[in-house]
Amino acid sequence: MAVFGVLILLSSFLLWKWGLTPNARTLVIPLLIVGLIPVIAGVSATISNNKRLIEYESMWNNDQQQFKLGEKARVEGFDEIFKYSYPAAILLTIGGAILFFLVGSPLWKSISLCMMVLGLMAYIIDHFAAERAIIYLEKINESLSDY
């Protein structure tokens, strides 16, 4: 995720440095904002995951069955997040597309393009996160049924 954000930030920098048209110039700040979101999210997720690994290891060593039950409850809670994130991603993407065709100014066209990028990025991330959650939950359930 952070790598994708860095690529967007690089695009923003390149447009700032060499973009000559009004549309290129107005994309700089919206792309900068859209690029910072996955960079910050990716870095903070990596830091928090590394901290949780130590905690998870000690929880696993203390009581494996309780750890699995806790993980099952945590992963099942992801469905609540996806109920809201999928529609938000779709609304951002479609809203950006509609806005792009309704407005004429380069700034609003740039904002609408960045809305579409943000929406697609959110949908792609959530799609793969949901897939991983399903696989993880299946493994947890298999492990719990072994006992």
Language-model features: where?
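Alpha-helical transmembrane segments of integral membrane proteins
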Residues: 26-30, 84, 110-114
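Alpha-helical transmembrane segments and their immediate juxtamembrane interface regions
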Residues: 108-145
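Long, highly hydrophobic alpha-helical transmembrane signal-anchor segments
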Residues: 1-39, 88-105
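Membrane-water interface of transmembrane alpha-helices
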Residues: 43-62
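Short, amphipathic, aromatic/basic-enriched membrane-interface segments that mark the entry/exit
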Residues: 1, 79-86
